[in-house]
């Protein structure tokens, strides 16, 4: 926690400085590598952690070393993780996917924006200073065409996005030769299919079956392809966004870059304050990861925050506005039906979802069915024209462990399953959002119900938080539940920061939430038995046993904190080569003792072997040379 609280002016100035001086940066002793595919432009980034050699013998004067292989790891930081790429936030990122989109020949540029709100914003000269300078000319599907990755997959097409993902999901593990590093315990996958090698054909088949989605709006060509599905690596989402109380465009762009640096696979912009449209444009043009939104938040701003005044027309205009900016997935609370709202009356904490409470209030005030449910097919038509994936929101998720797994929660889940099938009719990709607050013993039912009710569409959960007693530490309480539900089959975990229930997260909160959730996701991958998931753990354990401190720092999810904690007690350079740490000291280090035991056992084996040879020599008469038939 920062010792001095910055003023709003200082926070904005700090964020502006971050943006102005931004450069591609690698983690300590890491380098950016690229693995190329067979299709044009498929060049997949990874981070390779360089390791120091292991001392295996020799003398002090002439030590003998054995090289350790570099460890490739998944990297979602895009150009921000490559020191060779010049970064200019004012210009945005390179349009990686634009040639692929254009080559398919099924899109057309729009001469006029479809959203009335967008037209009004562009015509307002007063916004020129806030506006992103290089506004993209949006595209949409040509008449009668669909441009979704699901549409292509169902027709047997392997897109460049699918090949990119296959290479990325394999994490470069084919480069690893060491049997020690490749060793992996069998997992318990709970029905997930985890092939030893992920191919582009496998990616296509999973997308075609609806078990995975590739969020990739044709108007967000800057994004690097990624996949969300039970049979792939567990992903992590980070939430950012301004509010009416705090945060600016500069700070949100800073949080975006910061999020990708610490491993966010997708980012949701949940802005509810001023300049939502302009903030989102800056975020999209500078984001290498898919961006999600909750359109009802902005639609509510357009009617001055009065839920009863919401209309389908205002919401539709918001969908078009955001789709043409490049939003990759929409959270839509279409499962909050009028008849389900009374089911929440006996809850301890009622309806805690912002989107859910907005729609519940609208339904009750008009005594009509949810207009998102009523117009769901029209929503799907819009999504199919831009390849916006749907994240079907859990507006009735439990907000306390007491309310977990109740009638309202599962009634909505059943409706989300119905909506999933409708979306698939339009070739629209779908994932399902889940809770929430759920005690550990009740978590698995959430996964089994989702798979059954929603036809194996990917599950995306907020935690769940396993206890309600730890404000300020809810990244821990939820990380426990996230690891469990990820193991059971959840495809993406929405991070929770230390500020959950308390306030809007800052940069450090974002980092803490992401590190916690990267741990949870990785633990789930290990438990499922995802091929190659244990390589980094094995490399860390080997470095730890061999007292290669620099390698231990660099293999960590957060090398800076690992080094800082070590140096608090052993700051000298000699501490980086010491065969102990401050926890046990030199005389009680279990690993040093283990090495001594191993060396002693090896020496004993040699001594016994020499004794056996001596006995054999004497038994043969003590002759130096044996006759040929005796040898």
From Swiss-Prot:
Cofactor annotation: [4Fe-4S] cluster
Pathway: Cofactor biosynthesis; thiamine diphosphate biosynthesis
Self-association state and partner proteins as the record states: Homodimer.
Residues noted as binding [4Fe-4S] cluster in the record, renumbered to the chain: 581, 584, 589
Binding residue positions for substrate: 239, 268, 297, 333, 353-355, 394-397, 433, 460
HAMAP family: ThiC
Protein's name according to its UniProt entry: Phosphomethylpyrimidine synthase
InterPro entries hit by this protein: ThiC, ThiC-associated_dom, ThiC/Bza_core_dom, ThiC/BzaA/B
Entry's family note: Belongs to the ThiC family.
Upper taxonomic lineage: Bacteria, Pseudomonadati, Pseudomonadota, Gammaproteobacteria, Enterobacterales
Pfam family of the protein (one): ThiC-associated
GO CC entries: cytosol
Species the sequence originates in: Escherichia coli (strain SMS-3-5 / SECEC)
Superkingdom field: Bacteria
UniProt catalytic activity: 5-amino-1-(5-phospho-beta-D-ribosyl)imidazole + S-adenosyl-L-methionine = 4-amino-2-methyl-5-(phosphooxymethyl)pyrimidine + CO + 5'-deoxyadenosine + formate + L-methionine + 3 H(+)
Gene name linked to the record: thiC
Enzyme class: lyase
Cofactor note: Binds 1 [4Fe-4S] cluster per subunit. The cluster is coordinated with 3 cysteines and an exchangeable S-adenosyl-L-methionine.
């Amino acid at each position: 926690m920062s010792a001095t609280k910055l003023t709003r002016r200082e926070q904005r100035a700090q964020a502006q400085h971050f943006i102005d001086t931004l450069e591609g940066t690698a983690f300590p002793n890491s380098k950016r590598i690229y693995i190329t595919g067979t299709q044009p432009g498929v060049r997949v980034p990874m981070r390779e952690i360089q390791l120091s050699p292991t001392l295996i013998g020799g003398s002090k004067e002439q030590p003998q070393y054995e090289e350790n292989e570099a460890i490739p790891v998944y990297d979602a930081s895009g150009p921000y993780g490559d020191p060779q790429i010049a970064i200019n936030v004012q210009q945005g990122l390179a349009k990686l996917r634009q040639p692929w989109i254009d080559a398919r020949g099924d899109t057309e540029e729009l001469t006029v924006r479809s959203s009335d709100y967008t037209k009004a914003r562009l015509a307002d000269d007063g916004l020129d200073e806030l506006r992103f300078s290089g506004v993209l000319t949006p595209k949409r599907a040509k008449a009668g065409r669909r441009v979704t990755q699901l549409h292509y997959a169902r027709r047997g097409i392997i897109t460049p996005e699918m090949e990119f993902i296959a290479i990325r999901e394999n994490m470069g593990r084919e480069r690893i030769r060491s049997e020690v590093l490749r060793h992996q315990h069998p997992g318990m996958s709970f029905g997930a299919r985890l092939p030893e090698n992920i191919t582009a054909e496998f990616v296509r088949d999973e997308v075609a079956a609806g078990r995975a989605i590739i969020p990739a709006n044709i108007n967000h060509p800057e994004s690097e392809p990624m996949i969300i599905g039970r049979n792939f690596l567990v992903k992590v989402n980070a939430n950012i966004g301004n509010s009416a109380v705090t945060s600016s465009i500069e700070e949100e762009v800073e949080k975006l870059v910061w999020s990708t640096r610490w491993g966010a696979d997708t980012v949701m912009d949940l802005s509810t304050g001023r300049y939502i449209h302009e903030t989102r444009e800056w975020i999209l043009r500078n984001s290498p990861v898919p961006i999600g939104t909750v359109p009802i938040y902005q639609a509510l701003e357009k009617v001055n925050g009065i839920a009863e005044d919401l209309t389908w027309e205002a919401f539709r205009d918001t969908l078009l506005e955001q789709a043409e900016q490049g939003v990759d997935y929409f959270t839509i609370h279409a499962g909050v039906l009028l008849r389900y709202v009374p089911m929440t009356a006996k809850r301890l904490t009622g309806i805690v979802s912002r989107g859910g409470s907005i729609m519940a209030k609208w339904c009750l005030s008009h005594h009509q069915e949810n207009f998102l449910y009523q117009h769901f097919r029209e929503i799907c038509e819009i999504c199919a024209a831009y390849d916006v994936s749907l994240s079907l929101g859990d507006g009735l998720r439990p907000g306390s462990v007491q309310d977990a797994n109740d009638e309202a929660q599962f009634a909505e889940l059943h409706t989300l399953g119905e909506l999933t099938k409708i979306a698939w009719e339009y070739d629209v990709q779908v994932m399902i959002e889940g809770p929430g607050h759920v005690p550990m013993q009740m978590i698995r039912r959430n996964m089994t119900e989702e798979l059954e009710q929603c036809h194996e569409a990917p599950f995306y959960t907020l935690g769940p938080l396993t206890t309600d007693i730890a404000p300020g530490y809810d990244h821990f309480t939820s990380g426990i539940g996230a690891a469990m539900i990820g193991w059971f089959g959840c495809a993406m975990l929405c991070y929770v920061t230390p500020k959950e229930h308390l306030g809007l997260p800052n940069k450090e909160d974002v980092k803490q939430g992401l590190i916690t959730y990267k741990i949870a996701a990785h633990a789930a991958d290990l438990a499922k038995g995802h091929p190659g998931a244990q390589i980094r753990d094995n490399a860390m354990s080997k470095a730890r046993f061999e007292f290669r401190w620099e390698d231990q720092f660099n293999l960590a999810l957060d090398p800076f904190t690992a080094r800082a904690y070590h140096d608090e007690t052993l700051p000298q350079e000699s501490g980086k080569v010491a065969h102990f740490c401050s926890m046990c000291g030199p005389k009680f280090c279990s690993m040093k003792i283990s090495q001594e035991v191993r060396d002693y056992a090896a020496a004993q084996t040699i001594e016994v072997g020499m004794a056996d040879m001596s006995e054999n020599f004497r038994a043969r008469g003590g002759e130096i040379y044996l006759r040929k038939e005796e040898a």
